[in-house]
Amino acid sequence: APGGYGSPQGSSGTDVPAPLPVLQNADGRVPWCADGYYLAVRPQFTFDSDFHAGAYYVQEASSQFVGHIVAACGGIRGGRVLDLCAAPGGKTTLYSTLAGRGGLVVANEIVRNRAAVLADNVRKWGVGNVAVTVNDPSQVARLEGWFDAVAVDAPCSGEGMFRKLEEARTEWSEAGVALCAERQRGILREAWRTLRP
């Protein structure tokens, strides 16, 4: 089941309940995300004004695990965070909330139309501490040693989509995996340069 998590206000410590569309459909809490809920079924979120107003963001529960990792590493409140392969923005909204208004999240997406979706999701989330950029990782790497934390959800060969999409299974190839692995190595090489020593 998809996970849905509540508002940025709820994540940042104020006692704001999850939006009604999430609570009405909740099928238990996501143990590693304080504001995460499993959803029994996936409702038509696109018709929900709370969703469009940024009251919640829907993503897989596994994607919400990054909040647990960030906490285990000491948190990012007030820090500078690079989210290098950021679209569509689910993890970016989480980093934004965890960094707080005193922090900065640079959310980069190299594909322009995906960056537009990212920018829209960040705008709806409304924390106001995210700068969306459209750069090749080599350009971002010029900010050498500038970020306190760097997140990379690199493009992959799509095996995780096998259970959802028939086309993911039919388009898969060993050559595609090799190409993705090389691309990932390049992205990680550039991302590493931006991390504060």
Language-model features and meaning:
Residues A1-P197:
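S-adenosylmethionine
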